[in-house]
A protein has these predicted regions:
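Surface-exposed, low-hydrophobicity beta-strand/loop segments enriched in small/polar/acidic residues
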Residues: 2-169
Length: 169
């Protein structure tokens, strides 16, 4: 019979004990959440919607979207990614780090929402910091922004709500 342990367990049982990063064991969970009313003109191809600032050293646990039907047809697609900001201008670091060309905004989604955290992201990156999710070689410090980029336009105004859960040391 095999007994296999995660790194968290192996670190705890090691002699001397090895500390695991707080973002993966006993970290502080935080939440960013909100709602934005989107006009039909906010859903054009190449438009962006910034959801929330997240500390660059945080580890994203979950990104859930809840929305009205934002597309009366079947054209709306969007990415969920990471952006930096300078003087009010947002620059994509990885515009589809979490989700790529999702179609979830084409129909209303309530209830438990749609978790898009691993739609494009590999599950083995759980516990990785936001700056690493963005493909950066070092932590820029401060905040990075989680945002949506519309690849193909929607045409229906409505509300978009989000809940982003993340862990900090």
């Amino acid at each position: 019979m095999a007994n296999v342990s995660t790194t968290l367990v192996s670190n705890m049982l090691a002699l001397p004990q090895v500390a695991s990063p707080a973002r993966t064991l006993h970290g502080t969970k935080r939440v960013a959440m909100g709602t934005i009313a989107l006009a039909a003109g906010d859903l054009s191809a190449t438009d962006t919607v910034m959801l929330a600032p997240i500390p660059s050293n945080a580890a994203i646990v979950s990104i859930k979207l809840f929305n009205d039907d934002l597309d009366s047809g079947t054209t709306n697609t969007c990415d969920v990614g990471i952006y930096s900001e300078s003087d009010g201008t947002f620059t994509a670091l990885d515009d589809d780090a979490y989700a790529s060309a999702i179609t979830d905004l084409r129909a209303a989604v309530g209830g438990v929402g749609t978790d898009v955290t691993f739609e494009a992201r590999n599950i083995n990156t759980l516990g990785q910091r936001v700056w690493e999710d963005a493909g950066q070689s070092e932590d820029p410090g401060g905040y990075l922004f989680i945002g949506l980029l519309f690849d193909a336009a929607g045409d229906t105004a409505g509300d978009l709500s989000f809940v982003i859960e993340y862990v900090v040391n």
